[in-house]
């Protein structure tokens, strides 16, 4: 496949191809401009892959710029987290990290230019009055009584704002556009507001801060961005983006293009709702493995490659739609099926004793680390006469469809022997505590000599060598596909989104490291937890099951 064939195609790339072919641009320069007021989620990953991916494919540049214009909500913690997420996804920004606050002096100068042109004014309406005067989608707004102040008065008042002469909420700078515009964003939008708050980059130098719509377009222009890519909710804002650049003295005028945001089933993307989940302790934090945050997905065991593949598959369009969670899960399942080494762990253990196995003895059984990749090598796993198997792998009675261990019948232990269930012991409540079996000593990794067929295979862990492990069975956070549509989204949290089990793993799992996934044979894909696991306590998170159990539930 050629490089051109390997590239994804979408309407944005078609625009870029046309711009390069026509000579409108000779290079491509994009940017990813998050506000550092929270953790990035899977929706941001789509934008990261789009902006950085385009820059890579066209040998261009992509800036990482923090839109840090609201010191009240922003924190250096989020700056560091976002940088880490972008790098973990496999991307590198061009040059130094940028901050919108780098341009505060220039932004202030452009605001003064608009005042001098009679295109901006200081308004002393309260925020509530501004909302009231703005009108509605069906009714035009009305002019502020402060709209027709002279240039000189506006310059003096804006300087008074800058030097702390007004209290918060008592004055703001607004663009003078059209209060009757059919687009509410064009009804004299606020350009600057007062906030007496220390900024993580500029300290206490400023007490006036520019709004997003004023900052964003100018920052793009100052950085020479050729294609400013935003999600569809900013479509109307493009009019203001162009108005600002058309009315200031700036040599570059980037163009904004909008694409659909990522909506994913069984979760929420709203920063407000995600924050509520954290602050009300419905989850453990922003990196909870049930969260759609990049840090949560990483802790759960998702790989950067699987997230990039997911973003590639869903594509870039102007059509809003909701992606099935199964699509994301399919990407990580395919990745780990191909790349994760195998190991054995028993999640719901019951003791099995092989009565005719030499008492007190054990042996090593050779197992491949991957059934289809001999280059991944093999490992030695201890076997003994007492093992743990999963409780679901034994029944006293069963029909022909049940291919595991049944009383009086045989099954193969993975890469070991054929065993036959002879009897069980139970506790006072009737629960099986021990299964007693016999084994065929001539069947180590081979069929019985007499030709009898043994169809079932189950996994196991030697009891004498087993590592106690905590297993966190994570599932979808919500029980309905569209929790955001519920009257109370918290009421549809899945009560089974986290089930904690205590089981046993094979000794090789002692070497597990956070971020390195395993396939626990016949169970699913798991990784060591980065928060709770210690040298003395192994905690594994289920990344995803071997198959989509939700599809079955919906049938």
Swiss-Prot record:
A motif ('HIGH' region) lies at residues 34-44. PROSITE patterns: AA_TRNA_LIGASE_I (PS00178). InterPro entries: aa-tRNA-synth_I_CS, Gln-tRNA-synth, Gln/Glu-tRNA_Ligase, Gln_tRNA_ligase_bac, Glu/Gln-tRNA-synth, Glu/Gln-tRNA-synth_Ib_cat-dom, Glu/Gln-tRNA-synth_Ib_codon-bd, Glu_tRNA_lig_a-bdl. Its main location: cytoplasm. Keywords: Aminoacyl-tRNA synthetase, ATP-binding, Cytoplasm, Ligase, Nucleotide-binding, Protein biosynthesis. One of its GO terms (cellular component) is cytosol. CDD domains: GlnRS_core. It is an enzyme of class 6 (ligase). The keyword Nucleus does not apply. GO terms for molecular function: ATP binding; glutamine-tRNA ligase activity. It catalyses: tRNA(Gln) + L-glutamine + ATP = L-glutaminyl-tRNA(Gln) + AMP + diphosphate. It is found in: Cytoplasm. Residues 317-324 are annotated as: Interaction with tRNA. Pfam families: tRNA-synt_1c (PF00749), tRNA-synt_1c_C (PF03950), tRNA-synt_1c_C2 (PF20974). One of its GO terms (biological process) is glutaminyl-tRNA aminoacylation. The keyword Cell inner membrane does not apply. Its EC number is 6.1.1.18. ATP binds at residues 35-37, 41-47, 231, 261-262, 269-271. A motif ('KMSKS' region) lies at residues 268-272. L-glutamine binds at residues 67, 212. Coiled coil: none annotated. Monomer. NCBIfam families: glnS (TIGR00440), PRK14703.1 (NF011291). Belongs to the class-I aminoacyl-tRNA synthetase family. This is Glutamine--tRNA ligase. It comes from Salmonella newport (strain SL254). The gene is glnS.
């Amino acid at each position: 496949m050629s490089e051109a064939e390997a590239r994804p195609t979408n309407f944005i790339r078609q625009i870029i191809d046309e711009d390069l072919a026509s000579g409108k641009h000779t290079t491509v320069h994009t940017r990813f401009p998050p506000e550092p007021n929270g953790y990035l989620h899977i929706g941001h990953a789509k934008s990261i892959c789009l902006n950085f991916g385009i820059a890579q494919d066209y040998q261009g540049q992509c800036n990482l710029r923090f839109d840090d214009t609201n010191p009240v909500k922003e924190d250096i913690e989020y700056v560091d987290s976002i940088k880490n997420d972008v790098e973990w996804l496999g991307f590198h920004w061009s040059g130094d990290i940028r901050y919108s606050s780098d341009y505060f002096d220039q932004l202030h100068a452009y605001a003064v230019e608009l005042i001098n042109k009679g295109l901006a004014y200081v308004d002393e309406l309260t925020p509530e009055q501004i909302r009231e005067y703005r009108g509605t989608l069906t009714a035009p707004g009305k002019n502020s009584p402060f709209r027709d102040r002279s240039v000189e008065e506006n310059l003096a008042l804006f300087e008074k704002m800058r030097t702390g002469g007004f209290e918060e909420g008592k004055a703001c700078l607004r663009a003078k556009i059209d209060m009757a515009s059919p687009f509410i964003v064009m009804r004299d939008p606020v350009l600057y507001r007062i906030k007496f708050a220390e900024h993580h980059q500029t300290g206490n130098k400023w007490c006036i801060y520019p709004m997003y719509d004023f900052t964003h377009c100018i920052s793009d222009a100052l950085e020479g961005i050729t294609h400013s890519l935003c999600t569809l909710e900013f479509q109307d804002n493009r009019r203001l983006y162009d108005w600002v650049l058309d009315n200031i003295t700036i040599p570059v005028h980037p163009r904004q293009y909008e694409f659909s945001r990522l909506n994913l089933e069984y979760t929420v993307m709203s920063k407000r709702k995600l924050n509520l989940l954290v602050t009300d302790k419905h989850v453990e934090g922003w990196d909870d493995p049930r969260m759609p945050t990049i840090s949560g997905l990483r802790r759960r065991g998702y790989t950067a490659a699987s997230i990039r593949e997911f973003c590639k598959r869903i594509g870039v369009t102007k059509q809003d739609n909701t992606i099935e969670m199964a699509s994301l899960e399919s990407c990580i399942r395919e990745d780990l099926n191909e790349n994760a080494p195998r190991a054995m762990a028993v999640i719901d253990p019951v003791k099995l004793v092989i009565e005719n196995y030499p008492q007190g003895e054990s042996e090593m059984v050779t197992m491949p680390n991957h059934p289809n990749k001999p280059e991944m090598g093999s490992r030695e796993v201890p076997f003994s006469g007492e093992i743990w198997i999963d409780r679901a792998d034994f029944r006293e009675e069963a029909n022909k469809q049940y291919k595991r261990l049944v009383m009086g019948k045989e099954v193969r232990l993975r890469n070991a022997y054929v065993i036959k269930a002879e009897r069980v012991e139970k506790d006072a409540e009737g629960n099986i505590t021990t299964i007693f079996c016999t084994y065929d000593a001539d069947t180590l990794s081979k069929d019985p000599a007499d030709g009898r067929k043994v169809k079932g295979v189950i996994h196991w862990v030697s009891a004498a060598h087993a590592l106690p492990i905590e297993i966190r069975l994570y599932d979808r956070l919500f029980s309905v596909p569209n929790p955001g549509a519920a009257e109370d989204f918290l009421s549809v949290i899945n009560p089974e989104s986290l089930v904690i089990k205590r089981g046993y793993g094979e000794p090789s799992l002692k070497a597990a490291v956070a971020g390195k996934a395993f396939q626990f044979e016949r169970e699913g894909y798991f990784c060591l937890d980065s928060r709770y696991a210690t040298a003395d306590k192994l905690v594994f998170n289920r990344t995803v099951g071997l198959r989509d159990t939700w599809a079955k539930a919906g049938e």
